[in-house]
Design a protein with these regions (language model features):
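Conserved Class I S-adenosyl-L-methionine
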Residues: 190-254
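A short acidic, Gly/Pro-enriched loop at the edge of an enzyme's catalytic core
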Residues: 102-113
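Short alpha-helix
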Residues: 168-183
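A short SAM/SAH-binding and catalytic strip from SAM-dependent methyltransferases
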Residues: 113-126
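Conserved alpha-helix/loop element of class I SAM-dependent methyltransferases that forms part
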Residues: 23-42
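Short, glycine-/aromatic-enriched active-site segment of Class I SAM-dependent methyltransferases
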Residues: 147-166
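A short glycine-rich, Lys/Arg-flanked "PGG" loop and its adjoining helix->strand segment in the class I
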Residues: 127-141
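Class I SAM-dependent methyltransferase SAM/SAH-binding core
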Residues: 47, 53-103
Length: 254
């Protein structure tokens, strides 16, 4: 008898072949990187935490003289990253590590740059900063994209949704304060554009719905995943003026 896939297995199967597991773009990654001032001649050590299938990891490898440790909990995503890195001749710059982001085996002051796009929410913005700061050299940089309110008041539906999904959702000014209170000096910030959400994330997702449902024989769990994603897309289209991903770039000063 064929074993039924769990919800998390279905979610991985739905997202593993996508270029991205969240909003973003090559241009967003490079824009965030432009706020740093690394010596191009010095080989850097970089950690990309919660990397997924690694679209941004590839961008970093193509634009930095660096050894990049790409961390994710799910081997299916890391396998995709390894294949892409090899196809692009970047396999010598990227090391993949299957590990939880709250249990990392890194040394104190090991990295020049810690990167995480759309993933720090898993352990929370403040907790993530406090944990990961130890792995960063003084003068090193942290770059994070994080769900952020873009106004000080919101319609009840989207306010209630995000406070339930992620209680640490807040405005950029509050996130900057958290960075400053934890030994960082913010050097750059911007919101992700609508195309980073729609063109690069939601539209490709919509294109996969039918194939995913057919593959999994329209089971209740598979349909539930698609329905939840459709509702997320609806909320973004309806309330995009009130929230986005903010990209925060900060330098460790103490």
């Amino acid at each position: 008898m064929e074993r039924k896939m769990t919800e998390i297995e279905l979610l991985i199967d739905f997202h593993k072949d996508a270029e991205r597991q969240g909003p973003g773009s090559h241009e967003d990654t490079l824009r965030a990187l432009s706020f740093t001032d690394f010596d191009e001649k010095r080989r850097l050590k970089v950690a990309d935490i919660g990397c997924g299938s690694g679209a941004q990891t590839i961008s970093l490898a193509q634009n930095l003289n660096a050894e990049i440790t790409a961390v994710d909990l799910f081997p299916e995503f890391l396998e995709k990253l390894n294949i892409n890195a090899k196809n692009l001749g970047l396999q010598d710059k990227i090391i993949t590590l299957e590990k939880s982001m709250d249990d990392l085996p890194f040394d104190h002051g090991e990295f020049d740059l810690i990167w995480s796009e759309g993933a720090i929410y898993i352990i929370g913005f403040e907790d993530g900063i406090k944990k990961w700061k130890d792995y960063l050299k003084i003068g090193g940089y942290i770059a994070l994209s994080e769900i952020t309110w873009t106004t000080h008041s919101r319609p009840a539906e989207i306010e209630d949704h995000w406070k339930k999904e992620y209680p640490q959702v807040d405005t950029a000014s509050h996130k900057m304060k958290v960075l400053e209170e934890n030994g960082f000096s913010p050097v750059g910030y911007f919101y992700l554009s609508e195309s980073s959400w729609i063109k690069n994330y939601y539209k490709p997702m919509e294109d996969r719905f039918d194939q995913f449902l057919t593959k999994h024989k329209n089971t209740e769990l598979a349909q539930g995943i698609v329905d939840a994603e459709k509702d997320e897309i609806r909320k973004y289209r309806t309330y995009k003026d009130y929230f986005s991903y903010g990209f925060y770039i900060a330098r460790k000063v103490k």
